[in-house]
Curated annotation (Swiss-Prot):
Organism: Bos taurus (Bovine)
Protein name: SCP2 sterol-binding domain-containing protein 1
PANTHER family in alphabetical order: SCP2 STEROL-BINDING DOMAIN-CONTAINING PROTEIN 1, STEROL CARRIER PROTEIN 2 SCP-2 FAMILY PROTEIN
Pfam families: SCP2
Domain SCP2: 44-156
A GO CC annotation given for this chain: cytosol
Residues passing through the membrane, by range: none
Family annotation (InterPro entries): SCP2_sterol-bd_dom, SCP2_sterol-bd_dom_sf
C-alpha cells in the first residue's frame, strides 16, 4: 500500500518541477470487499467442474490407471458443505456432485482451505494427512492415485 504521493507541478513553461510536495497518507483501511483469493465455500465448485470436464475428455485412460471411486466431503466449520464423487472405476469415468452412487473405495473428509491448498500444490498431501489436516476412510493408499489425477488435471 502506498505511504505517500509525490506531486510534481510545472507552474510556467521554463520552470522545473516544484520540489517537496508530498502528501503523507494515514494508515490504510481494510477494503470493503474481501480479498478475491479469500476462501469461501464456492471456490471448490469451479475446481470440481473443471476436473469433471477433464474426466470427460480423458476419463477412459484414467479408469484404466486408477480403477477407484473417490468421495470428497468438503467441510467448512466442521460441517459438510459440498460432497463430490470422482468415479474412475466405471465406464469412461465421471465426476458429479453428491455422495457416491456405488460404494466409494476412499472417502476424504477435508476442510475447504486445506483442499484448495492441496489442489493448488501448496501443501504436500502425505504431510497434511499425517498432520491430521484431513481424514481418509477406506483404502488410504488409493489417495496417491487421486493425487496423480489432480496433478494430471493441473497440467491439462
Amino acid at each position: 500500500m502506498w505511504k505517500r504521493i509525490d506531486h510534481q507541478l510545472k507552474i510556467k513553461a521554463g520552470d522545473g518541477p516544484q520540489a517537496g510536495q508530498f502528501k503523507e497518507l494515514g494508515p490504510g483501511r481494510e477494503p470493503a470487499v474481501p480479498h478475491p483469493l479469500s476462501l469461501s465455500e464456492f471456490q471448490t465448485v469451479p475446481v470440481f467442474e473443471d476436473i469433471s470436464q477433464h474426466v470427460k475428455e480423458v476419463g477412459s485412460q484414467l479408469v484404466k490407471k486408477v480403477n477407484a471411486i473417490f468421495q470428497l466431503d468438503i467441510t467448512k466449520d466442521g460441517k459438510t458443505v459440498h460432497q463430490w464423487t470422482i468415479d474412475l472405476k466405471n465406464g469412461s469415468g465421471d465426476t458429479y456432485r453428491g455422495p457416491a452412487r456405488l460404494p466409494a473405495d476412499t472417502v476424504f473428509t477435508i476442510p475447504e482451505p486445506v483442499f484448495m491448498e492441496l489442489i493448488l500444490g501448496k501443501m504436500n498431501p502425505q504431510k497434511a494427512f499425517l498432520a491430521g489436516k484431513f481424514k481418509v476412510s477406506g483404502k488410504v493408499l488409493l489417495g496417491q492415485k487421486l493425487e496423480r489425477v489432480f496433478k494430471d488435471w493441473a497440467k491439462w
